[in-house]
Amino acid sequence: MEEILAKELPELFKGVSDIFAEKKDELCEMDANMGDGDLGLTMSKGFGTLPDLITENMDENNLGMTLVKAGMKMAAVVPSTMGTLMSSGVMEGGKKLKDKKSMGRQELVDFLEGYVEGIKKRGKCEVGERTLLDAIHPAFEAAKEAFDSGKSLKEIMEATVEGAKKGVEATKEMTPKYGKAVVFAAKAKGIPDQGAMAGLYLLEGLGRYFV
């Protein structure tokens, strides 16, 4: 498989919907220690609706705009901070694929680059500040490296997940700078950031399509 057609996007994101349903309680528990305790609910609700939102906004000749429109609708479903960050990633990633009919090797890298830009733009955050970005940015860097090495679409996706895992691990040594996590900064040492974990699960969910 070297490309994903626009009409296959709902199935691609079904893996994300499934993984967040499975990890809902785990993410809520992590978030209860460092935040509001609703992260798992937000992720399962938002990404749970995304496959249907993609279907409803499907344009088989424009994969990018399909994602942009679905991302906008997703933002309305989960208007919380993390919901907004995740849906902004979908929208900005979609903008990178405007007028594309399919997602191949280059398009996957471009989508991830857009996802990073969406998080940065909406969250006003940078790498190293213990956020979702600390999983997605190293994932994008790993994807780019795999692409440059001539890896297949499946291999690029696998590299993306590995990059995110390393990013999540690195958050254990980072100090939180945003939200309620700042109050619990002393407890953060040695514990992965829950937002970064959500980013890893997003990518692992996408990876299920290739299994």
Where in the sequence are the language-model features?
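N-terminal loops that bind phosphate or other acidic moieties
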Residues: 1-211
